[in-house]
């Protein structure tokens, strides 16, 4: 399965062409040409490392078979999705990292991907083994779309085009450098793409309507970007914080992130050992987010696509990492995302929620404070 991830990535880089990126001043996370993860918790691996993994003695075995086990799926509660209740916060899981968030009179869609494959083409690349719980056209009015980064399983041109047509007043919030993709790919129907708001880490933008106002803050995470051969890390990746301006409710969206790097030669029995993992450098950004913006009423944290651990750990949380992130940002309740939709890596389909439950128990935490939703399921809290 890891070979599927690696070969798809290679295929993707070969067919894409013109890079898009931001020309910015030098910062800790930007050298003026490319973005970077400015922490000891990140180690960069490339195609040479992937090739070694594919051809080495411990290479992964790829199976093209569709998983036989499926995540639980429920019918969407459309009455809930269409209600206007300023005192409730609703989050509905639509598959992978996509969440339909209802908060203070706003409908916000996070990392929407409704295509059959997360790929530059629809005849090759990772194919979803669980269908979305609804059609994109069935969703209520969308006020805002938030994108975490430009990988194909988080930014899908066909989905963006459909959203643009169906919701002409919708705004798109993206990390620095990604507005250029909208100009190049032209997924929106408006000239100049003034509907796209581009932010750097720790920059914020507000959205208002007749009932209230939300603040979107682009915050750090540990990942990378790229849709083609020449554009690796030329656009920024981000987590996001969504707040009501009155401070009544706060939501964290992790998008796609790593937490620490498990060294290549780590023994298999130590790769998920909490005592050993605690000795490794971890990304300090999440504690900073917790201190500056937290605590959060709800956090949406990735828990899947983490094996083989040495290769995926810098960019993808394991469930054990996700629990530490949950604690760092001071989340009152968290939902696991980024699993149960595409087979991208080696771990069994149902392993992420099982490991998540075990990791919560190991830390002495209430397993109900960080769990997963069924596909189409909604988590609701009063705010």
Regions found by a protein language model. Give the residues of each.
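Active-site environment of divalent metal-dependent phosphoester hydrolases
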Residues: 151-155, 179-182, 203-206, 224-226, ...
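Short amphipathic alpha-helix with an adjacent loop that forms part of the alpha/beta core around
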Residues: 133-141, 205-212, 217, 286-292
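Active-site-proximal loop/helix segments of hydrolase catalytic cores
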Residues: 158, 225-329
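Long, hydrophobic, well-ordered secondary-structure blocks that form the structural core
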Residues: 143-144, 149, 158-207
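Active-site metal-binding motif and surrounding structural segment of the metallo-beta-lactamase
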Residues: 123-174, 291-300
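Active-site neighborhood of phospho(di)ester-bond hydrolases with catalytic His/Asp-centered motifs
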Residues: 109-111, 141-151, 173-175, 252-257, ...
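Metallo-beta-lactamase
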Residues: 2-138, 243-255, 297-298, 304
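Binuclear metal-ion centers of metallo-dependent hydrolases, dominated by the metallo-beta-lactamase
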Residues: 186-211, 290-292, 307-383
């Amino acid at each position: 399965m890891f070979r599927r991830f690696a070969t798809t990535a290679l295929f993707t880089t070969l067919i894409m062409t013109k890079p898009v990126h931001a020309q910015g001043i030098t910062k800790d996370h930007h050298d003026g040409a490319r973005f970077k993860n400015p922490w000891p918790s990140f180690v960069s691996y490339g195609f040479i490392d992937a090739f070694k993994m594919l051809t080495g003695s411990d290479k992964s075995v790829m199976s093209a078979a569709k998983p036989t086990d499926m995540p639980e799926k429920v019918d969407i509660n459309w009455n809930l999705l269409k209600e206007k209740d300023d005192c409730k916060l609703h989050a509905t899981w639509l598959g992978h990292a996509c969440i339909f968030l209802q908060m203070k009179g706003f409908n916000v869609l996070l990392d929407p991907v409704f295509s059959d494959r997360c790929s530059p083409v629809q005849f090759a690349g990772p194919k979803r083994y669980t269908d979305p719980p609804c059609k994109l056209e069935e969703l209520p009015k969308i006020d805002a779309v938030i994108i975490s980064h430009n990988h194909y399983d988080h930014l899908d041109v066909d989905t963006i085009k459909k959203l643009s047509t169906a919701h002409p007043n919708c705004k798109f919030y993206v990390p620095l450098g990604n507005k250029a993709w909208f100009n190049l790919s032209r997924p929106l129907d408006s000239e100049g793409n003034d509907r796209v708001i581009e932010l750097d880490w720790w920059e914020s933008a507000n959205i208002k309507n007749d009932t209230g106002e939300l603040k979107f803050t682009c915050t750090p995470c540990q990942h990378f970007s790229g849709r083609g051969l020449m554009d690796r890390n030329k656009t920024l990746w981000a987590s996001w914080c969504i707040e009501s301006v009155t401070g009544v409710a706060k939501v964290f969206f992790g998008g796609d992130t790593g937490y620490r790097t498990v060294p290549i030669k780590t023994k298999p029995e130590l790769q998920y050992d909490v005592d050993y993992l605690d000795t490794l450098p971890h990304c300090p950004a999440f504690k900073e987010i917790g201190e500056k913006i937290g605590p959060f009423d709800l956090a949406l944290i990735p828990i899947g696509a983490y094996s083989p651990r040495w290769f995926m750990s810098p960019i993808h949380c394991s469930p054990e990492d996700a629990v530490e992130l949950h604690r760092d940002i001071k989340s009152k309740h968290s939902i696991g995302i980024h699993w149960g939709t595409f087979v991208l890596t080696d771990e069994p389909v149902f392993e992420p929620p099982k490991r998540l439950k075990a990791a919560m128990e190991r830390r002495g935490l209430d397993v109900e404070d960080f769990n997963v939703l069924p596909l189409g399921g909604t988590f609701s809290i009063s705010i």
